[in-house]
Amino acid sequence: ASRASAWALMGDTRLALAVARGSGRATAQLGAVARQAGNAVSLHGTGGAWIIAGPDADPTDMASAVYHSLDRKVCNTLNTMCITADRADDLVPPFLHALTAAGKRRGVNPKLHVAASSIGHVPSDWFTAVVPVARAEGAVDEPMAEPIDDSDLGVEWEWEDSPEVTLVVVDSVDYAVERFNAQAPRFVASLISSDAEEHERFFRSIDAPFVGNGFTRWVDGQYALGKPELGLSNWEHGRLFGRSGILSGDSAFSVRMRVEQSDPDVGR
């Protein structure tokens, strides 16, 4: 009964577009009601941003991007971190430091999921340390890091207070793009690299409507465009308006967006 009014609204055939904010089963159910009524619908679906650190990545810039992408859990929060194997020895440590710092900022421990193929790149004490992790039901004692299957890189971590991220070490930026296109929600992607040509290849090959070179939390209508955001163009059932973008109250157009961030310390 508590949801009857929402079902009635989404099923009203006078609607030109039904926008269901958020994600999860409740949002999917609202979308199903709208679609059954023949209404166009925009659902956020699965979120989670990816950051890829290439061979020319600056460790400090990468760490800043990670830290500022983990201030809170929303759809544009960093979810999956890819580091190329040739830089793993010098990029994994600052990544772990940034993840730890993001947790300390919130007064909690972080949670790390490591692709099975990449376990050897993370210090063993991350896997043996059992720490309180802030969950919805309260603090739960868990290993600070746990392995996951390489097929689970796109799983979105719906964390409460403890920043939760997947780490995978990849052969190349091109391979990371392949994994993104195959496993990610194809939402937000950021490349950390000082190679201009690599950025151009990245933009051409990655199937993401939002592409950047720093922190991922810029993907927001109010923050990036100064416009009231109704929602994000649908990626739950394909792109609603072509390539996707931000739905605002003053425009029905949707374009692919790219940010070139000059200050690596920008955050929200």
Features from the language model and the residues they span:
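Short acidic active-site motifs
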Residues: A4-W7, S172-Y175, E198
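General beta-strand structural signal in soluble alpha/beta enzymes
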Residues: A1, V19-G22, V41-G45, H113-V114, ...
